[in-house]
Structures are given as C-alpha cells and as structure tokens.
Amino acid sequence: MSQYTVVTGAAGFIGANIVKALNERGETNIIAVDNLTKADKFKNLTDCEIADYLDKTEFLSVVEEGVLDGSVAAIFHEGACSDTMETDGRYMMDNNYRYSGALLKFCQDEGAQFLYASSASVYGSGRVFSESRECESPLNVYGYSKFLFDQSVRRLWAERTAQIAGFRYFNVYGPREQHKGRMASVAFHFFNQYRAEGRVKLFEGCDGYPNGEQRRDFVSVEDVVRVNMWFLDHPEVSGIFNVGTGRCQSFNDVAVATVNACRAAEGQDALTLDEMQAQGLIGYVAFPEALKGKYQSYTEADTAALRRAGYDGSFYSVEEGTARYIERLLQS
C-alpha cells in the first residue's frame, strides 16, 4: 500500500477542502485527524473519501509511539484553535504550538513533507506584511502561538531533512466553513444576515477608517487549496509564505458583492454601495469594545516570496470569489 497523506483539522474549513482536493487528484489513502467534540463538522467529510479517521489526541499518541513510522508521505497540518478571541493562553499554546512541534519533529525524522497553517495574525497592527521578523507583532495569544511556531521552524532551516512549508493565511472565505460560528468569514455572515433580514450589518469605522472601510486581504479557499497542492507537488520548496491575493479590499466590498450575488440569483439588478445604503440594505453597528486594540483594520499580503518560490497561479478578487461562494451557499 502507498504511504498515507495526513490532514489534521480534516473536518474543519481549510482541512476539509484539502481532503476534497486530494480526492479530486485521485488520492484516497488519507488519514483524517480532528476533534469532533463539535460533531456537526463531520458534514464536511461526507462527500470525501478517506482511509481512516483518528481523534487528534489519539493521533499524537500514535505518532509518538512509532506506529506510523515509514507510513506517512506528507502531513497537511491545518488543525488548531483558530478563535482569535480565545483567552485561555495555556490551552492555545498546547494546542497550537506544542502539538505542531511534535508533528514537525515526526516529519523531519521520517523525511515526510510538512505543510502547515500559519496565520496573517502574526503581523498584528503593522502596515507591512512581509515574512520577516521585524514585521511580526501579534495582538492576541492565537497570533502569538502561530508566531512562536514559525520561529521554531526558522531555527530548523539549516538542519531540515524534508520540506517544511508554512502558510500565513489571510482572511479566507468559502465552502465548508459553516461550523465556525463567530469565526466564520464575513461573507458567510453577510449571506445569512441578508437571507434572514434582507439587510447586512457591518462594524462602524475604527482606527481612522470610515464605516465599513476597514480593509483586509480576503482570499478564497479555492486559491488557498491550489497553493497547498502546488507545494505538495514541489517538495524541494521550503519556507514561510503569505497566502493572500496581494490586494486589500474593504468590508463594504464584501457586503456589496454578497448582496449583489444574492440579488443576481433572484433576477434583480446589481446595486452600488451608495444605493444599498440609501435603501437600507447595508447598515452599521458600533465597533465592539472587546475588539479594540486587538483588531487588524488593514491587511495586505506581500506575495513576493510566494512568487519567487515559483507559484504563478492567479487569485480571485472579492467580487469573483464571493460570487462563486454565494452560488454554492444557495445550492446547499
């Protein structure tokens, strides 16, 4: 039997999309690893083919006991606590930092590819989003857990025995995120608000930005998966890379794209932001006190390192990617 490909966080948002992409390449010898305490996540895997499922704790034990020695070709490590508002730092560091370190060691010992999820949250409130230490200053313990693991990876560069590729995901949106609750993308929340209430609510301005004009690099999960598959096919390429479009867009842009995608499905004409505001389709609510000082009002991936590595794929704009996503949501 061929070696396994392992996907941690396999029932989660990005992990499930990676499993599906592997299936589409003919790969089914997949070990899916996750924590199904929130059982609804299983729905993300019902249209996927896998060889086995292991709980995240069981998988770590299997790895440390040597049961999988010689049996793993690659690990996509997407599993983590991704709640940026989580305040239990001890849990966050154990789950995101220590666990990742154990899997990295296993892959280096085994000569297996290790492709893992980092995060744009490592950059904090900075204005430059380049993969270098001077740009990194996380605002919360989630970002710190990702930052610290990236630092441990950097210390291994000279001695690495197999591919290590870390991906600093920016604001990812797309199918299979329905279980994420408050941490789901704004496109998902806007879609549900519009369907339920006929309008969309955004945060008022902050950090000098007008209402809804805070800007992020919103990237489709379809593009994120394509980047992961490219690195799987290029085991000679290692590094830490931003994964975003390289172009920031406003939350207003996402809201307009979402509403217009819904309107198009109903045979209605597209509207501008001004028209939506005038008709009460887009409104604003006070910026939450709990997020002040912990919120990234601006992100934009510097994709130069990704391009230098050889990846030349294009990325969907908010308008393109959101339209594709809303079409999927309307079909579900």
Curated annotation (Swiss-Prot):
Output the Gene Ontology terms for molecular function. Answer: ADP-glyceromanno-heptose 6-epimerase activity; NADP binding
Q: Which organism is it from?
A: Thiobacillus denitrificans (strain ATCC 25259 / T1)
- Name its co-factor(s): NADP(+)
Q: In which pathway does it act?
A: Nucleotide-sugar biosynthesis; ADP-L-glycero-beta-D-manno-heptose biosynthesis; ADP-L-glycero-beta-D-manno-heptose from D-glycero-beta-D-manno-heptose 7-phosphate: step 4/4
The residues responsible for catalysis, as annotated, are: 142, 180
* Protein name listed in UniProt: ADP-L-glycero-D-manno-heptose-6-epimerase
What the protein does? Catalyzes the interconversion between ADP-D-glycero-beta-D-manno-heptose and ADP-L-glycero-beta-D-manno-heptose via an epimerization at carbon 6 of the heptose.
Native organism taxonomy = Bacteria, Pseudomonadati, Pseudomonadota, Betaproteobacteria, Nitrosomonadales
Q: Which Gene3D superfamilies match?
A: NAD(P)-binding Rossmann-like Domain, UDP-galactose 4-epimerase, domain 1
* UniProt subunit comment: Homopentamer.
Task: Supply the alphabetized keyword list.
Answer: Carbohydrate metabolism, Isomerase, NADP
Q: What is known of its domains?
A: Contains a large N-terminal NADP-binding domain, and a smaller C-terminal substrate-binding domain.
Cofactor binding mode and count: Binds 1 NADP(+) per subunit.
